[in-house]
């Protein structure tokens, strides 16, 4: 497994917090953590930080669908003409063609950005210069925003007369490819055993390109090793500690760390501390039914002291429908695809 480097090919790799390809522009710092070379599709991931008052002006992507997750600080976002005050844990769905821009309101602002379907991730190298530091520069240099154009799928939009009243963050995501903001811990919550899964973005929001979900739980056993033929999984540790097996070895992830698991890579994870929480992006999004077979609806916001039954039997029943090869499981050899071994 590659560590603290982007391998420029489809291979498993792990990045410690702050590692990646860093570009500075003005008092902004963009750290690329994944590119089309690694993802084998037009997509990119980046960590965005900046000084208080640092702004990314209104713009839109013609082809790139963007998802934002607030990691730290307070950010004001303009989304489709409406202002939102974002705080840690908020999630933003930005379909292609949606006008948006943001400003950091304190010195600790940090956003996670994933773009799928276009080359908007190239905008950071266009705007900035390679940068050795791991914190944003204290710079008053003017940024030449005019370098952004359709060649990096990022076109500036003249500021309009949008409303000043703060828009309300949602508690449940709508259906379809529409822009929206979910408040922290909100979304479609489900539970499997003692782990709570919260779907932030389902496949309807991106026309099947990806899903985004939070997972949290206490110390527990490792899930069985498995792999996918076409599915890529992107893991961001937010809290606690998780041990991941990917490819040919184990790696521990701590808050801020990232792991890329491409198709045909045997992998597994285990939560090693109580209240561990991680954010995952899964592409393509047609793997979503797996979580609906595995989980049952859940009204709570934290994992329960007495968990409900773990319904892996339902996954086994529907194995033939899923891009999933189970390499090990407790109590017997891997089941054959499409063959049920337990009753519903």
How would you describe each model-predicted region?
Residues 50:
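Short glycine-rich catalytic loops that host catalytic nucleophiles or stabilize transition states
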């Amino acid at each position: 497994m590659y560590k603290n480097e982007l391998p420029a090919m489809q291979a498993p790799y792990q990045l410690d917090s702050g590692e990646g390809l860093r570009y500075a522009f003005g008092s902004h710092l963009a750290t690329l953590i994944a590119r089309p070379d690694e993802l084998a599709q037009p997509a990119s991931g980046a960590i965005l930080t900046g000084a208080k008052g640092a702004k990314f002006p209104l713009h839109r992507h013609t082809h790139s669908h963007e998802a934002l997750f607030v990691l730290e600080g307070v950010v004001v976002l303009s989304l489709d003409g409406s202002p939102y005050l974002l705080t840690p844990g908020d999630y933003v769905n930005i379909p292609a063609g949606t006008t948006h821009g943001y400003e950091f309101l304190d010195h600790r602002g940090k956003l996670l950005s994933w773009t799928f379907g276009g080359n908007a991730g190239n905008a950071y190298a266009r705007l900035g210069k390679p940068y050795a530091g791991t914190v944003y520069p204290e710079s008053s240099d003017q940024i030449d925003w005019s370098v952004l154009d359709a060649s990096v799928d990022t076109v500036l939009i003249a500021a309009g007369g949008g409303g000043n009243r703060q828009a309300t963050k949602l508690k449940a995501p709508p259906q379809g490819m529409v822009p929206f903001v979910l408040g922290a811990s909100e979304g479609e919550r489900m539970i499997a055993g003692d782990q709570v899964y919260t779907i932030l973005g389902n496949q309807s929001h991106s026309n099947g390109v990806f899903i985004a979900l939070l997972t949290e739980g206490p110390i527990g056993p490792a899930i069985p090793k498995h792999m996918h033929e076409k599915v890529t999984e992107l893991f961001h540790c937010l809290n606690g500690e998780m041990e991941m097996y990917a490819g040919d070895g184990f790696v521990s992830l701590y808050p801020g760390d990232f792991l890329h698991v491409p198709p045909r890579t045997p992998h597994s994870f285990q939560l090693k501390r109580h209240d561990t929480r991680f954010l995952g992006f899964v592409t393509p999004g047609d793997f979503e039914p797996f979580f609906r077979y595995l989980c049952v609806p859940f009204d709570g916001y934290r994992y329960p002291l007495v968990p409900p039954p773990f319904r892996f039997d339902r996954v086994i029943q529907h194995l033939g429908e899923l891009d999933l090869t189970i390499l090990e499981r407790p109590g017997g050899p891997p089941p054959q695809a499409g063959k049920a071994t337990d009753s519903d």
